[in-house]
Amino acid sequence: MRFRPATLLASLLFAAAAGPTLAQTSVPSASSATSTRLDPTARAAIVAQLATELRSRYIYPDVGEKGAAAITAAAASGAYDRLTDLPSFARRLTDDLRGVLHDKHLAVFGETNRPAISVASIPGGEAGIVRADRLAGGIAYLEIAGFSNPWSFKPALDRAMAGLKGSRAVILDMRGNHGGDPASVSYLVSHFVPAGKRIEINRIVWRKAGTRDLTRKPFFSERTPVSFAGLPVYVLIGGHTFSGGEELAYDIQTLKLGTLVGETTGGGANPGQSFPIGHGVMAFIPTGRAESPVTGSNWEGRGVQPDIAVPDADALATALRRLGQSPAAATISPVSVFTQRAVPLRGSEAMLRRLLAGRAAPEPDYTLLAADTGEPGRAAFAATHRRLQPLGDPQAIHFRRPDGFGFDEFTLVYPDQTLLVAIELDPSGKFRGLIGPDKVSP
């Protein structure tokens, strides 16, 4: 499950359009659709299917009904008649629905779009971990841009935390964190829970499609190789902290494990999933909500409030002062204790080569697809296949880096160009998603 803001990545959400367990990290840009022209019949069909999906799946049934009614009425009034290109239509549907639902995760976008975020602009740092430094005064500093899937996040975090062992305080920088998998969020929080104590950190409430029935998936603290329980913990937050990044801050605050410093966060707490709605269009629909076991609520629509309110640019300096250190401690003699891996995960290059080798087939080989991705995953895989079909055989394939979303990035070398792609597999080696291909700038 994943949370991400609307300014990020149709490509990732669409690439990783797995089941709801993936849905809390990424939200597509409404403007990331293709330039397909839409006739009145296509527009009517898209609105009708989107309304059906909202009524069946949106986490709050009554609110979903209001959204469905709003776009149905708008279509009947002729409000969409002049929106003949897919990007404009997708943007208008997104805006209309957000005006009713007030949900920053919801978005409509084109399934065969060029990625809303290029591979080259994906945050660096293995599995979302950008930096792990030991600052002056024995202060551990950890910057995390996102929470990737737990099978890539946990080993990377374990290496970072091992290097920070023995610190007297911890600063977690979430100011640029746009979300991720709640299992990975809970694993980070577990480092600050007293050893031997198992507590419920968060839960996700899911709506069963077509009903008003709800299920709850709890996330508990886990044993970690290194513990920082009892140490002063400061979490830096700001307006760009969103979704899973907000969950980390909310968990730390409600469980009284640390202090939040900075500005109020973005306010997105409803995870979801992308669904095909016809004519090359997808909709990301929140099908769940976060629920704190402490408050019974979450941060949706209002954000997480800091304990110490300062401009987010001043948050690190403020935390350092609270710890008795000069703000210069952030730049004087930091010692990096984390080096990202320099080799691809097992199977990622082989899977990429297999996808390229099969690109001429009319349909992708669905036996390669992770089992839990469902129909949205099949649609995403088909779109990936279509994006790869125009490519020739690369002269060479080179591993570039692990990225901040838990994907492995590769360059595809051709005589006249070099392309970037990023691929994600599940723990069993099955395909979960691909971003790109994107041209490498000269």
Q: Which sequence ranges carry the predicted segments?
A:
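Short, well-ordered alpha-helical segments enriched in acidic and aromatic residues
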Residues: 67-73, 355-376
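Terminal peptide-recognition signature
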Residues: 50, 97, 142, 172, ...
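Solvent-exposed loop/turn segments at secondary-structure junctions
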Residues: 112-115, 146-150, 176-182, 198-199, ...
